[in-house]
């Protein structure tokens, strides 16, 4: 009987072999635990129309499950807001938190396949860091991921992607994400 070998994600392997050493030299860390790494990736899809039609949330759940390979959590309204015809407990979005190997695989697919498929894409804004090295950006449609069949999309949905790093500053986070292959605009 053969034993199956666990395959490391390509981006994780590259981080451990090249990127970690380059960041250590660039910032002069004394301890290996100071070197920034990606902690988690949170993918959020807001579905405000689900307040009027509860079936719309199923399409968002299916799309996000295909894109991330993990079952999304349905997010519900915490407060009732009359102007939006929203009641407490109604579904308003779906969210997935990716960690470990799934996170590395998702980042690899995002940077090498999905972002280059965006029409008129000129790079990500380098100014969307939160002050402690984490980066948040949005995608206008889910069709840029090759897992989603364009013919089976019931409606175009955007999503927010939050890449949480262990970096202490925005410069460290920017250097890490640039080394991982995130295409930032040059000012």
From Swiss-Prot:
UniProt keyword annotations, A-Z: Ribonucleoprotein, Ribosomal protein, RNA-binding, rRNA-binding, tRNA-binding
Disulfide-bond pairs as recorded: none
Molecular function per GO: rRNA binding; structural constituent of ribosome; tRNA binding
Ligase keyword on record: no
Matching Gene3D superfamilies: 3.30.1440.10
GO biological process: translation
GO CC annotations, alphabetized: ribonucleoprotein complex; ribosome
Assembly: Part of the 50S ribosomal subunit; part of the 5S rRNA/L5/L18/L25 subcomplex. Contacts the 5S rRNA and the P site tRNA. Forms a bridge to the 30S subunit in the 70S ribosome.
Function: This is one of the proteins that bind and probably mediate the attachment of the 5S RNA into the large ribosomal subunit, where it forms part of the central protuberance. In the 70S ribosome it contacts protein S13 of the 30S subunit (bridge B1b), connecting the 2 subunits; this bridge is implicated in subunit movement. Contacts the P site tRNA; the 5S rRNA and some of its associated proteins might help stabilize positioning of ribosome-bound tRNAs.
Similarity-based family: Belongs to the universal ribosomal protein uL5 family.
Name this polypeptide is given: Large ribosomal subunit protein uL5
Gene name for this UniProt entry: rplE
């Amino acid at each position: 009987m053969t034993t199956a070998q666990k395959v490391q994600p390509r981006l994780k392997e590259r981080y451990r072999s090249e990127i970690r050493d380059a960041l250590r030299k660039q910032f002069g860390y004394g301890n290996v635990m100071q070197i920034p790494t990606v902690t988690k990736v949170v993918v959020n899809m807001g579905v405000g129309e689900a307040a009027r039609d509860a079936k719309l949330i199923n399409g968002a759940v299916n799309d996000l499950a295909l894109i991330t390979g993990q079952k999304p959590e349905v997010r519900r309204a915490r407060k009732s807001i009359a102007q939006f015809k929203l009641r407490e407990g109604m579904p308003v979005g779906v969210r997935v938190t990716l960690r470990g190997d799934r996170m590395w695989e998702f980042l690899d697919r995002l940077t090498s396949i999905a972002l280059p498929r965006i029409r008129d894409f000129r790079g990500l804004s380098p100014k969307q860091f939160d002050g402690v090295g984490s980066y948040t950006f949005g995608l206008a449609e889910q069709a840029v991921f090759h897992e989603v069949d364009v013919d089976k999309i019931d409606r175009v949905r955007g999503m927010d992607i939050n890449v949480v790093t262990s970096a202490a500053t925005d410069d460290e986070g920017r250097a890490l994400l640039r080394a991982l292959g995130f295409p930032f605009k040059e000012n």
